Regions:
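Short secondary-structure junctions
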Residues: 24-26
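Short, contiguous alpha-helical
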Residues: 8-12, 19, 29-83, 128-174
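A non-catalytic, amphipathic alpha-helix used as a structural packing/dimerization or gating element
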Residues: 9-17, 102-106, 110-113, 153
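Acidic/histidine-rich alpha-helical segments that form the ligand environment
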Residues: 81-125, 142-147
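N-terminal export signals and maturation junctions of secreted/periplasmic proteins
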Residues: 1-5
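A generic alpha-helix structural signal
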Residues: 22, 45, 101-104
Length: 174
């Protein structure tokens, strides 16, 4: 297995974990901010959409036209960006849970399709140009590696939100 294939598989596995969490919480609870937290399920999912686009598409191969057709990129970057944001929740009048689910799947499909056409040769090349310094990566390998690690980090937050809303932790293999 090549390094790019390994990274792609890790991104797929992390998303499978997120998809399990998504399937376990009713959509009517996605916008509730549990007591003693600052976030809701919907914001976390929106954040994962823009993060995967950023870490695994934009800085790897540049802005992707397919992504722009699926999500309002500029709006979502403002609403769901996690770097220094003061708000980690979103209201239902902005976007519905079903739309977020669909967009989560669509951006992931674009990501995997995009990565499937790449080889290990690109991994240690500089990131595609962006107007600010990438928060953790200097090259494409580091960005792709961070993508799945970041997704698993937020899986823990999503799991805690879900638990605080009365839906217990369910491990993958019972």
């Amino acid at each position: 297995m090549s390094k790019i294939e390994f990274l792609r598989e890790q991104i797929i596995e992390a998303r499978n974990f997120v998809n399990r969490l998504v399937s376990e919480l009713p959509e009517d609870l996605w916008f509730v901010i549990p007591e003693n937290t600052d976030s809701n399920f919907a914001w976390q999912i929106g954040h994962l959409i823009v993060a995967q686009n950023f870490h695994a598409i934009t800085v790897i191969t540049g802005l992707n036209e397919k992504v722009k057709q699926v999500i309002p990129l500029a709006q979502y970057n403002k609403q769901f960006n996690g770097m220094g944001t003061l708000h980690r929740s979103i209201k239902e009048d902005v976007v519905t849970a079903s739309v977020l689910k669909s967009q989560l799947d669509a951006v992931h499909e674009i990501c995997i399709e995009n990565l499937s056409g790449l080889s290990d040769d690109i991994l240690y090349t500089p990131l595609e140009p962006i107007p600010f310094r990438h928060p953790v990566a200097e090259n494409k390998y580091e960005a792709l590696s961070w993508c799945f690690k970041h997704e698993m980090w937020h899986s823990a937050e999503v799991e805690e939100i879900k638990r605080r809303l009365g839906y217990p932790i369910i491990w993958m293999n019972k």
